[in-house]
Amino acid sequence: MTLWINGDWITGQGALRVRRNPVSGEVLWQGNDADAAQVEQACRAARAAFPRWARLSFAERQAVVERFAGLLERNKGELTAIIARETGKPRWEAATEVTAMINKIAISIKAYHVRTGEQRSEMPDGAASLRHRPHGVLAVFGPYNFPGHLPNGHIVPALLAGNTIIFKPSELTPWSGEAVMRLWQQAGLPPGVLNLVQGGRETGQALSALEDLDGLLFTGSANTGYQLRRQLSGQPEKILALEMGGNNPLIIDEVADIDAAVHLTIQSAFVTAGQRCTCARRLLLKSGAQGDAFLARLVAVSQRLTPGNWDDEPQPFIGGLISEQAAQQVVTAWQQLEAMGGRTLLAPRLLQSETSLLTPGIIEMTGVAGVPDEEVFGPLLRVWRYDSFEEAILMANNTRFGLSCGLVSPEREKFDQLLLEARAGIVNWNKPLTGAASTAPFGGIGASGNHRPSAWYAADYCAWPMASLESDSLTLPATLNPGLDFSDEVVR
């Protein structure tokens, strides 16, 4: 029984799904997808639970969420192993994900009060108040690269605001989704407040097509995000928050410490085997001898990155990709770029057949026309050389995406120029593209999102504002508008 609907674990009525470790092939989880009727059932449960959950005080909802945080802490080792085994990422990185989930609780509580709490302003004849109200029933679509942390970034603020939820994990990480749901169950969530439906495309389509849905919170690919946007385009009454990918540029301008810059680049491009939406996909490198030296060092150090299994000792920097198919897609993308005229500096290699262990790839595309503006979701870095900083900014902005952008340079003036001209929601200076602050919004523009950033701003899309003018008594104004007559004289 792998679906959690209205406080009960039930068996899915859809197709059988089996999840294997992407490196070893070990069977980790199996269960049946939710069919359309069960998705409807989950929605009815969420709708029925909404009034009571929304009427609880914030402190009461906060208490449940904080119990969940405590359970995460006590079960950190077990959840770390589940996420690592299912995604293929190393144990150390899965542990940082669970830590981020724990930290998200306190951050979300604070963000609720700052972004969507209550405010009151006194007026001469009363007061003006601002409150926030939950939307109702929200669907949360989770991604596979951070199957605990990223859905958590939607679920926690949505629950705090008073919404009820139908959560569909990625079909590639059902075990992680179930493990997190069991912790929510232990935290004492009332039946129907959070429901879990497993499945792939058909389950997702049934969920997004629900009429009695007040909103959808999505993290995933741009293609799927565009499909959801089209599907809900005629329904402005439904909130839609899209967090999508990027074709992110990292500009290496002047480098004081080559090894430090190489380290930053590897952290930007290859952490999580290149499976972060903020990963650097395009390296824009200044022409000249220093750039040549940097590139040679980058290739040399990247060549030493050997992917390993989740529990290998010593621990590897990167593990496997989410699937063998995903790894093969990266290899295919590299082959296509090479066929277009790209110059391979480091060829990506599958370490063995029927696994997702893939070494990083680096290919120079300077002077090659018609390079697709697409996100390759894996450890493949494309390199372009530039002559002037103005040219670098033009190249950085030459994308339909707009998630992250970074600059390595000792010059504050150049960063200030980039801040003015960059088209990206995250712009970093001498910091990895994959780094983000929990007290800042996280999201992009263009094909990277729809102006509903998550993280610190997640509270914004989990509640709607209600403005009120208030007075505890009613009296006739001393001064009336022209044309109003309240005298006792009878008009004949």
From Swiss-Prot:
Pathway recorded for this protein? Amino-acid degradation; L-arginine degradation via AST pathway; L-glutamate and succinate from L-arginine: step 4/5
* Name by which UniProt lists this protein: N-succinylglutamate 5-semialdehyde dehydrogenase
Identify which residues the record assigns to the active site: E243, C277
Q: Which SUPFAM superfamilies match?
A: ALDH-like
Q: Name one Pfam family in it.
A: Aldedh
Q: What does this protein do?
A: Catalyzes the NAD-dependent reduction of succinylglutamate semialdehyde into succinylglutamate.
- By its UniProt entry, which PANTHER family does this protein fall under? ALDEHYDE DEHYDROGENASE-RELATED
